Amino acid sequence: MVKLLDLQAITMQHAEEYEAAVKRVIESGWFLQGRENETFERDYAQYIGTKHCIAVANGLDALKLILRGYKELGVMKDGDEIIVPANTYIATILAITDNQLVPVLVEPTWEHLELDINKVEEAITPRTKGVMTVHLYGRIAYNDKLGDICKRHGLKLMEDCAQSHGCTWEGVRTGALGNAGAHSFYPGKNLGAFGDAGAVTTDDEELASVIRALANYGSQKKYVFRYVGMNSRMSELDAAILDVKLKYLDEDNRKRQQLAAYYYEAIDNPLITLPQRLNDENNVYHQFPIFCERRDELQAYLKEGGVQTLIHYPIPPHKQECYKEWNNRSYPITERIHQQELSIPMNQVVSREEAETVVGLINNFR
């Protein structure tokens, strides 16, 4: 079986370093908000290129805390609108609605799969307070035009970087392109913990201070609570593991890019559409999506041939039961993506032989 993601093989590459990190935490006797968190926050902020990094419990919390922070600072209020791509993962939408804000869904482009920046400006209303761009599949969802639009209209530009660790635009990493970035370290990410973990990156000192307090029950001083906060803290164990993994992130991304280059060169089937190829700096290939009108048949065929795949994602947010008031809306490009997308094996431990198996099966699909 060619696995979509072989976490065991990925983990065993640096097992001794992980064991040493875990041993260090155990021997310290300190498991929350300690030296490991401080070290990872410093190293990740330096890697991303921001002044601040706040380690939190998961990627969804990171998204929620950015928006909540802006509400506490008076930048946003209940009922304000946030522009967001219609084809994003549900977490992006949940963070907005959980903050009593209104998601304004904007279509992606079919070629690029990311937010159609040319449609952003027409979606702006007097109630719009921000844009949440999502670097889906590891592909950049930013350009200078988006930055200019947000500046011109006084909007906060927030990045969902859950799938884009290490991706850059003109030398600037995702998470440093806008006003704040939310990061997920779910185990399957390019930079993944051994459990759930997340972070917020920003240059905004005031926002960082508020988010740090909100994530710690709303407290800036022990047992003194300025805000109605939440419990969203990264464990010392996960911080220690992530700091080990961070050293290898760029190398791992290069291996993903090499695999993607082979897929682009070798996949040749008129029934299969590949997304527009980007420069390597603009894509860290969290997933490698392919598209087929007979997607379900293709997935069953690949499974029979010993290739594991996954759909990202079978149901778009506006068709989910939890947002049933949106179910009658029509977003044709989003729906086409969700009807045809199939993710094939993409990670740094896929061998050339395994990649050839994947390509051979795809090319022979009829």
Show where each model-derived region lies.
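N-terminal "arm"/small-domain region of PLP-dependent enzymes with the aminotransferase-like
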Residues: M1-W30, R35, G305, P345
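Phosphate-binding glycine-rich loop
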Residues: W30, R35-E81, A95-T97, L105, ...
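PLP-dependent aminotransferase class I/II
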Residues: N37-R42, Y47-I54, L60, N118, ...
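Short beta->alpha connector loops at strand-helix junctions that form conserved
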Residues: A86, L105-T109, Y313
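Conserved coil-to-alpha-helix start sites within the AMP-binding
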Residues: N87-I93
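Structured binding elements
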Residues: Q100
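Active-site phosphate-binding strand-loop segment of PLP-dependent enzymes
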Residues: E111-A193, A199-T201, S343
